[in-house]
Amino acid sequence: MFRLGFVASPETGHEIYQGKLAIPYLTPSGVIDIRFRSLNNDNGPKYLSRPGATTHIYNISALTQDSSMLVVCEGEIDTIIATQVGFTAVGLPGANNWKPYYSRVLDGWEKIMLFCDGDNAGREMAKTISRELDNVFPVFMPDNQDVNDVFLTEGADGLRRRVGA
């Protein structure tokens, strides 16, 4: 479904991506972008994008699902977890990557639940998106935790309880 990969032996000039999780941004017509996530606690950045890449909504195909509620997550991994739990979910590639035109893409959903990390960036993301869309309901994860942390400690039911499901 998400077609994740691992960069074992990168092409010359792309060594920076070695050992990273490859996260493709898929559309019905194919891959439109790819981001890379560090799998260890090295000193480098947690996420890398290709030079010159623009931001996109992750898991855009979820927008075609028949559902009254959409979950918007902060990050690709959180989006994958939310989807596996059973939510119709899309993600932003980080809390600070909201683009004003995303409101047109997300308009029309009966209810949009924002799964926000329990930090300042998550709170700012909630404020920004809530100013642009009327049907937004922020769901904050505990302090310094994200969807993945809650899933690992409380399981799928812990996430479902947060939205009353």
Predicted segments with their positions:
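Hydrophobic anchor at the start of a short beta-strand
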Residues: A89-V90, I112, N135-P138
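Short, aromatic/basic amphipathic alpha-helical patches
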Residues: E124-D134
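Short, surface-exposed amphipathic charged segments that create phosphate/polyanion-binding patches used
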Residues: R104-G108, N148-R161
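Short, acidic/turn-prone active-site loops that include or flank metal/cofactor-
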Residues: P93-W98, D117-D119, M141-N144
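Phosphate-handling DNA/RNA-contact segment within nucleic-acid enzymes
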Residues: F2-E110, M125-A126
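Glycine-centered helix-coil hinge/cap
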Residues: N59, G75, D134, G155-A156, ...
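A polyampholytic, Gly/Pro-enriched intrinsically disordered region
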Residues: I112-G118, E154-A165
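Acidic beta-strand-to-loop metal/phosphate-binding motif
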Residues: V72, W109-A121, F140
